[in-house]
Structure formats: C-alpha cells, structure tokens
C-alpha cells in the first residue's frame, strides 16, 4: 500500500472514530463494558496518545535521526496484510499502559485533533525520508517513516474493532 493510500485511510479511520464518539453517551463513555477491559474513554485516550507518540520516531526517520537497520520478515507480513496476527495478542507496553486514563468527550476530541494536526504536518515530509533509516518500535523492531505510518493505520484499525466489540456488549 502506498503512503497516499495509507494517509487517506488514516483520515477516514479518524473520521469514523469522531462519528462513533458523538454516538456514545457520556455515561457509557466512562463505563467498563460488560465484556470487561477498557472503557470507551480509555480506548480513545490510548489509541490517540499512542498514535501521537508514534509520530515522534516517524519524524526522527524523516529528519535522519535514525539508524540503517532492516525490518524483520514477520513485521513485513504484518505491514503487507495490514493487520496484527489474529491469534497473537499484543500486550500494551508498560510505559504506555501507565499512560492510559479515563477522559471525557471533549478530551477525546482534543486527542483526535492533536493527532490529525501533527499527522497533517508530518505527512508531506515522509516522501523525502531515507527508506533505509529506521527507529525502534517496542514490539515490532526497526521501522522506517513509511512503515511507522502503516503501523499507525493498523493500530487505529485494531482499536476500531475493539470499539465495535465494546458497542456490541452494551
């Protein structure tokens, strides 16, 4: 998938998150769902916090503050298929898990907006990034700027599925 298609996909996914947000009552937004796990608010805070944090190493690749490493084959498969392996459960890295907190609708809108603004600023620079320069992802190894963009898309899609599961449980 090329960067333009990934970028447009991310914009559509963000729009979907925004539409879904407006349909969730403030009370349900804070509740732990019947299926357990994170509340809607925690999912929103996590996914957009993680997405914003993922822009930082992407920017490092863009600006040449990265190393020449290879992306491992298993990760290339994830990037190609656009999804995490179905049987594999990824545990949130401890440093991100500690950041998860409940937020309200307005804060969720702020997180979405902050991510979209930063992505819009960074995206045009990806094409000038050296594809051989990579920064370390805590679970996937070394990624270049385009691969970071793709991982952001995959992660956003993954948590969109989680929101759908939460919705069905109420």
Language-model features, listed with the residues they occupy:
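Long, hydrophobic N-terminal alpha-helical segment
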Residues: 3, 10-17, 21-49
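Short, contiguous alpha-helical
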Residues: 31-80, 125, 130-170
């Amino acid at each position: 998938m090329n960067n333009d298609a990934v970028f447009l996909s991310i914009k559509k996914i963000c729009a979907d998150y925004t539409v879904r947000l407006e349909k969730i009552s403030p009370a349900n937004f804070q509740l732990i769902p019947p299926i357990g796990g994170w509340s809607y608010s925690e999912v929103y805070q996590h996914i957009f916090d993680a997405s914003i944090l993922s822009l930082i190493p992407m920017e490092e690749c863009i600006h040449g503050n990265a190393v020449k490493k290879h992306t491992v084959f298993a990760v290339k498969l994830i990037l190609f298929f656009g999804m995490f392996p179905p049987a594999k459960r990824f545990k949130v890295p401890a440093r991100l898990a500690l950041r998860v907190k409940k937020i309200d609708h307005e804060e969720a809108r702020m997180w979405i907006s902050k991510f979209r603004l930063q992505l819009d600023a960074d995206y045009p620079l990806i094409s000038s990034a050296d594809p051989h320069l990579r920064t370390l992802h805590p679970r996937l190894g070394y990624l270049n700027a385009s691969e970071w963009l793709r991982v952001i898309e995959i992660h956003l899609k993954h948590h969109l599925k989680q929101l759908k599961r939460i919705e069905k449980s109420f």
